From Swiss-Prot:
F(1)F(0) ATP synthase produces ATP from ADP in the presence of a proton or sodium gradient. F-type ATPases consist of two structural domains, F(1) containing the extramembraneous catalytic core and F(0) containing the membrane proton channel, linked together by a central stalk and a peripheral stalk. During catalysis, ATP synthesis in the catalytic domain of F(1) is coupled via a rotary mechanism of the central stalk subunits to proton translocation. This protein is part of the stalk that links CF(0) to CF(1). It either transmits conformational changes from CF(0) to CF(1) or is implicated in proton conduction. Pfam families: OSCP (PF00213). F-type ATPases have 2 components, F(1) - the catalytic core - and F(0) - the membrane proton channel. F(1) has five subunits: alpha(3), beta(3), gamma(1), delta(1), epsilon(1). F(0) has three main subunits: a(1), b(2) and c(10-14). The alpha and beta chains form an alternating ring which encloses part of the gamma chain. F(1) is attached to F(0) by a central stalk formed by the gamma and epsilon chains, while a peripheral stalk is formed by the delta and b chains. This is ATP synthase subunit delta. Keywords: ATP synthesis, Cell membrane, CF(1), Hydrogen ion transport, Ion transport, Membrane, Transport. GO terms for molecular function: proton-transporting ATP synthase activity, rotational mechanism. It is a peripheral membrane protein. It comes from Lachnoclostridium phytofermentans (strain ATCC 700394 / DSM 18823 / ISDg) (Clostridium phytofermentans). InterPro entries: ATP_synth_OSCP/delta_N_sf, ATPase_OSCP/dsu. The keyword Membrane applies. It is found in: Cell membrane. GO terms for cellular component: plasma membrane; proton-transporting ATP synthase complex. Belongs to the ATPase delta chain family. PANTHER family: ATP SYNTHASE DELTA CHAIN (PTHR11910).
Length: 182
């Protein structure tokens, strides 16, 4: 159910942004609003508090965001509150931002390495991904995990390329085990 709510509201915001030709502006505003929600857990507690009326919640959110973000984004937040969907707000924002990336043909890559990767290597990885995928740009996320021993693991969406030494050793071990049994 939660994913359906996120999709429904995220699509509505995306369509509104396209219709008003304000996709870039709304994208930046949603990123900023999302950051406010992520950094202020008290705001989430306030919105989820059962004894605070929807009207009080709407007034509070309007007080925070009106004049700081567009009327479209403020109005969207008000609708979410009036419909009682504030507990889905993070999922709605994530869906909207994913939809924007899809529209702009921007991929998101998660790269795991055993050691820190230099800036030059990061550029080479990004260039290789751009050359071998349909994306025109990438949001790159790097993580160091010494347990993979060496190589890289690259995840883009639901696709994973695992060229880690750990994976290769596991495969070799399985193959040797099969030979011993055969």
């Amino acid at each position: 159910m939660a994913k359906l709510v996120s999709k429904t509201y995220g699509e509505a915001l995306f369509d509104l942004a396209l219709e008003n030709q304000s996709l870039d502006i709304i994208e930046e505003e949603i990123k900023a609003v999302k950051m406010v929600f992520n950094e202020n857990t008290e705001l989430i507690k306030f919105l989820n508090h059962p004894k605070i009326t929807k009207e009080e919640k709407v007034a509070f959110v309007e007080n925070i965001f009106k004049g700081r973000v567009s009327d479209d984004v403020t109005g969207f937040l008000v609708i979410i509150i009036k419909k009682g969907r504030y507990d889905e707000i993070s999922g709605i924002f994530d869906y909207f931002l994913a939809k924007v990336r899809e529209h702009k043909n921007i991929g998101v890559a998660y790269v795991t390495s055993a050691v820190e990767i230099s800036e030059q290597e990061k550029e080479q990885i990004k260039d290789k991904l751009l050359a071998t995928t349909k994306y025109v740009q990438f949001e790159m996320n790097y993580k160091v995990d010494a347990s993979i021993l060496g190589g890289l693991i690259i995840r883009i969406g639901d696709r994973v390329v695992d060229s880690s030494l750990k994976s290769k050793l596991n495969t070799l071990s399985k193959n040797l085990f099969k030979i011993q049994l055969g």
